[in-house]
Regions:
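Active-site histidine-anchored catalytic micro-motif
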Residues: 1-133
């Protein structure tokens, strides 16, 4: 079963909590026990799992990734000027597996699932595939 969500990001770089969208898809699927794959089919966006209780964690992650891979590097050769976004996306990855048990998405107490925007604002697709266990 495949679900697709559209997310309009608002900033050049952001982390959008998509946990509830994924939980909603799990409920709609009616599956009790399943394997779940979440993917973003983009080369300048990614997915990550991280703390969702304190918004400062997201801010710190974005600040630190910008420090590691600065947006502006005059030695980049890619004509579009977004090589930084491709690299950041590659570091995070575009697909993550999850488990559904007793009809619920299994996450740790503080875990949330984030769509990471590195070349926004843009309209992004989030693909949620739910497979019977």
């Amino acid at each position: 079963m495949l679900f697709e969500e559209t997310i309009k990001t608002q900033h050049p770089q952001a982390m959008v909590d998509v946990t509830q969208l994924i939980r909603n898809a799990v409920k709609k699927s009616g599956r009790k026990d399943a394997h779940l794959l979440v993917s973003v089919p983009h080369t300048t966006a990614a997915l990550t799992i991280n703390e969702n209780a304190d918004p400062d964690v997201v801010n710190d992650l974005l600040r630190r990734i910008e420090h590691l891979v600065p947006t502006t590097d005059h030695s980049d050769r890619h004509a579009e000027g977004n090589s930084h976004a491709h690299l950041k996306s590659s570091l995070f990855g575009s697909c993550h597996p999850f488990i559904v048990k007793d009809g619920e998405l299994v996450l740790g107490t503080w875990q949330g699932i984030y769509l990471c925007e590195f070349d926004g604002p843009r309209t992004r697709r989030l693909l949620i595939s739910i497979l019977a266990a």
